[in-house]
């Protein structure tokens, strides 16, 4: 009985001590670089967040990963080691989000993934992917293509994880919706011209073009 009383007292004391502890949310975004058109708006939204969360004080620490996956991983580790983040959020690009999720799993802290990244194993154990799966997202596109009588579909997208996800989603949806994928053209996020890819794409005479960018 005495042990139970002491244990209960210790638990109550710890609860009281942590009741008003600051919650630190570490965020890495592509505020600059190729993904800035999305990252800037995410940053602006985070800056509007309140100072409390569930009645507890909260602080959002936002770092710029310049839309680079390597920087995103470095930011994630910095947020954990230096800012003592309780949870991670990011990034606005799939490749960067994947790298962050791996860092979160290493540190064994939860992460909210802001892109439809495909994760597995221990990495998925520590992460929650917020957006809908890419295949569900692209099913609406496939439905529209079918409704407009499209048969031949050209594809052009990023030469990274996101471009792969969109293309694979269209591959899986092609047969059920009566579509034929006739191209798989790619370009880097930093490319300033895609003239060559577009010319090759148009030479196949597609009825419509899907852009995974």
Q: Where is each model-derived feature located?
A:
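Gram-negative bacterial Sec-dependent N-terminal signal peptides
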Residues: 1-19
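Loop/turn elements at helix/coil->beta-strand transitions in domains of secreted/extracellular proteins
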Residues: 22-23, 55-59, 83-87, 106-110, ...
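Beta-alpha junction/loop-to-helix N-cap segments that form part of ligand/metal-binding clefts
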Residues: 24, 37-44, 52-119, 187-194
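Redox-cofactor binding/interface segments in oxidoreductases and associated redox assembly factors
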Residues: 27, 90, 211
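Cofactor-binding loop segments of dinucleotide-utilizing enzymes, especially the Rossmann-like FAD-
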Residues: 30, 65, 158
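Extracellular/periplasmic Venus flytrap/periplasmic-binding protein
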Residues: 74, 126-213
